[in-house]
Amino acid sequence: MNITLLKSKIHRASVTEARLDYIGSISIDEKLLQASGILEYEKVQVVNVNNGARFETYTIATQEEGVVCLNGAAARLAEVGDKVIIMSYADFNEEEAKTFKPKVVFVDENNTATKITNYEKHGAIF
């Protein structure tokens, strides 16, 4: 039996751009992708903290520092300045799942990583 777990998370990033006319995806600062362990073209779930919208797309790495840009149809689901949580998931067998810990990246208002951990404590905001 396989179990799907949170693999990686970029927590409360600020949307810096929304480009409706661009081919669909989410462009993310490559430093954030590397810090989180999310790969370019990996499927991600994006949750908009401001309006509750949830959607899936794939990532595109950008060398532009601090960029989190929603592209294509996803651009209708957030406004510049909205806070989003970007998550990827992976399948594990039962034994792997018992010991796996996700990588969680906390960012500041400029989308610069401030803390990287593999643990989230309920009720704590880093």
Swiss-Prot record:
The active site is at S25, Y58. The modification Pyruvic acid (Ser) is found at S25. Binds 1 pyruvoyl group covalently per subunit. The keyword Manganese does not apply. It catalyses: L-aspartate + H(+) = beta-alanine + CO2. Its EC number is 4.1.1.11. Is synthesized initially as an inactive proenzyme, which is activated by self-cleavage at a specific serine bond to produce a beta-subunit with a hydroxyl group at its C-terminus and an alpha-subunit with a pyruvoyl group at its N-terminus. Signal peptide: none annotated. It is found in: Cytoplasm. Heterooctamer of four alpha and four beta subunits. Catalyzes the pyruvoyl-dependent decarboxylation of aspartate to produce beta-alanine. This is Aspartate 1-decarboxylase. The gene is panD.
